[in-house]
A protein has these predicted regions:
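Rossmann-like adenosine-cofactor binding region
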Residues: 196-273
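Short, structured coil segments at secondary-structure junctions
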Residues: 66, 97, 117-119, 179, ...
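Glycine-rich phosphate/diphosphate-binding loop of Rossmann-like nucleotide-binding domains
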Residues: 49-61, 144-220
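Adenosine-phosphate binding glycine-rich loop
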Residues: 255-256, 261-316
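Phosphate/diphosphate ligand-binding glycine-rich loop within oxidoreductases
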Residues: 33, 37-144, 266
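Positively charged, low-complexity intrinsically disordered leader regions
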Residues: 1-61, 311
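Phosphate-coordination loops involved in phosphoryl transfer and adenosine-cofactor binding
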Residues: 39-44, 152-157, 255
Length: 316
């Protein structure tokens, strides 16, 4: 594939291929020296206009483990602060001969716009409240590992929290339903999108009603940086109604798993320490992020005979 900008751009076979490739990358990451020459000679630019810890560092680690060069763009020390436009920034970096941009931006649609200005590949690391496709891949892979199968038929996924402002929710809904899961959204009406009736989901305003039948409980933080005032009465009341408390955790099925994309707001959506939950996959999500992003970079940047570099390593 040339770009990865949204889950909707993928077909089911593409999604499964990337998850299978992630298994190969995970095997590399278990080695004493987790590095292969698969993308030697390729240059990846980390173009982040929003703060990030997990996504940015996992992409940079993924590129290095595939032997690609990584250039980290710093907005605070760039010509953007001198008034340079996004287009001029992209075209300037393209002229340096880079092969891929990993882009995060506060505005929806920016990865598609950048693709009009460069012949390099574009990987969307989050655009506003729109899409976060690699997080959805991380989550699907982590669930697949936990349940031991590729099909999510019969799986009840409950996503709780600020759906309205969540790019993770949008990408995960697309990915989980593509693999056969039933998705239920739980949030106050003020934190649901206005066009929610068009989405392939069920909606509830009570976590207590659905928690006992949930197989995957996916908690989201309140995105205060994108929220208008007055969408919730206060953090305390929100946490009491929609947070994962000890009492709610005890009502989960024994086989149910708990997930969160991070960063967590402890005492708001998470009242329990993930370390105290035997069924938490939160740390696995972080660990799997590197393998997933290795698979994406390889799929986007490997051309022709370069596949042999992994075949020679015995992992492709």
């Amino acid at each position: 594939m040339k770009h990865l900008r949204s889950i909707e751009e993928l077909g089911k076979e593409d999604l499964l291929r990337l998850l299978d490739s992630t298994e190969h990358m995970a095997e590399i990451n278990r080695r004493p020296i987790p590095k292969v020459p698969a993308l030697r000679g390729k240059t990846v630019v980390s173009l982040f206009f929003e703060d990030s810890t997990r996504t940015r560092l996992s992409f940079e680690t993924a590129a290095k483990r595939l032997s690609a060069e990584i250039m980290t763009f710093s907005v605070s020390t760039s010509s953007v602060n001198k008034g340079e436009s996004l287009r001029d920034t992209v075209e300037t970096i393209t002229d340096m001969g880079v092969h891929a941009f990993v882009v995060r931006h506060k505005s929806a649609g920016v990865p598609w716009q950048i693709a009009q200005w460069t012949n390099a590949s574009i990987i969307n690391a989050g655009d506003g409240a729109h899409q976060h496709p690699t997080q959805a891949l991380v989550d699907c892979y982590t669930v697949r590992e936990a349940i031991g199968r590729s099909s999510f038929e019969g799986l009840n996924v409950t996503i709780v929290g600020d759906i309205k402002h969540s790019r993770v929710a949008r990408s995960n809904i697309a990915a989980f339903t593509m693999l056969g899961a039933q998705v239920t959204l739980v949030a106050p009406p003020t934190l649901l999108p206005t066009h929610i009736a068009q989405w392939p989901v069920r909606v509830s305003h009570s976590l207590d009603v659905v928690i006992a039948s949930t197989d995957v409980l996916y908690m989201l933080r309140l995105q205060s940086e994108r929220m208008d005032q007055g969408l919730i009465p206060n953090l305390g009341e929100y946490g009491n109604r929609f947070g994962l408390t000890d009492q709610r955790a005890q009502r989960l099925q024994e086989s149910a798993v708990v997930m969160h994309p991070g960063p967590m707001n402890r005492g708001v959506e998470m009242h329990v320490d993930p370390a105290d939950l035997p069924n938490s996959l939160i740390h696995k999500q972080v660990a799997n992020g590197v393998s997933v992003r290795m698979a994406v970079l390889f799929d986007v940047l490997a051309r022709g005979g370069e596949l042999n570099s992994l075949k020679e390593e015995g992992v492709a």
